[in-house]
Amino acid sequence: MGNSALRAHVETAQKTGVFQLKDRGLTEFPADLQKLTSNLRTIDLSNNKIESLPPLLIGKFTLLKSLSLNNNKLTVLPDEICNLKKLETLSLNNNHLRELPSTFGQLSALKTLSLSGNQLGALPPQLCSLRHLDVMDLSKNQIRSIPDSVGELQVIELNLNQNQISQISVKISCCPRLKILRLEENCLELSMLPQSILSDSQICLLAVEGNLFEIKKLRELEGYDKYMERFTATKKKFA
């Protein structure tokens, strides 16, 4: 796109605090945004061809609350992303991320994280440090197992649909706020689903269709009645 068009977007963003430039074929993060590091609350550069984020620039958006880079070509995130201390929403669906920076747990204000359609092979342990995270979408990755560290997650909703999960730690039942757990279209045998999810957790919506067992078999497990009590109580609350 032309420089004059980009300038117009930058000028508008100076007034609104919102910079949105989607579907423009951008191959890099616009350097002109360095003029707006103290203005911007929202950046949306989805549906472009951006391969990397400039480390020195990205960490300067200290007032940023929402960052969306869905449908780009990102392979790594710079450590400097951890400087975004006010960031509440981070959306990076459909990129090529295999891991997250070790500093990721320092995004202390983060509430919503979307990483669907990447190449994560494991549940990143850094996510367990995010105390205010409410919703996390890790669907359509390559995660094979859920480790013990999952018990420290603070999320209310966890989407792990369409991974390759065949093992889940019993610690998932210890998540203090987890209400919605989505595990559809994975590789789970019924024997690998911790019974404590049904009997001893806060989970009131468990979605497990498309695994290696029939749903009616789930209803025969000990603890299913307790799960249904929670499910029904929640339904009534929102009816």
Swiss-Prot record:
Signal peptide: none
Lipid-modified residues, N-myristoyl glycine kind: G2
Protein name (record): Leucine-rich repeat-containing protein 57
Species for this entry: Homo sapiens
Keywords tagged on the record: Leucine-rich repeat, Lipoprotein, Membrane, Myristate, Repeat
TM region(s), chain numbering: none
Subcellular location(s) per record: Membrane
Taxonomic path: Eukaryota, Metazoa, Chordata, Craniata, Vertebrata
Membrane-topology descriptor: Lipid-anchor
PANTHER family with a match to the protein in the record: LEUCINE-RICH REPEAT-CONTAINING PROTEIN 57, PTHR48051
Entry's Gene Ontology cellular component terms: extracellular exosome; membrane
Cross-referenced InterPro entries: Leu-rich_rpt (IPR001611), Leu-rich_rpt_typical-subtyp (IPR003591), LRR_dom_sf (IPR032675), LRR_domain-containing (IPR050216), LRR_R13L4/SHOC2-like (IPR055414)
Start and stop residues of the LRR repeats: 39-60, 63-84, 86-107, 109-131, 132-153, 154-175, 177-197, 202-222
SMART domains: LRR_BAC (SM00364), LRR_TYP (SM00369)
Major localization class: membrane
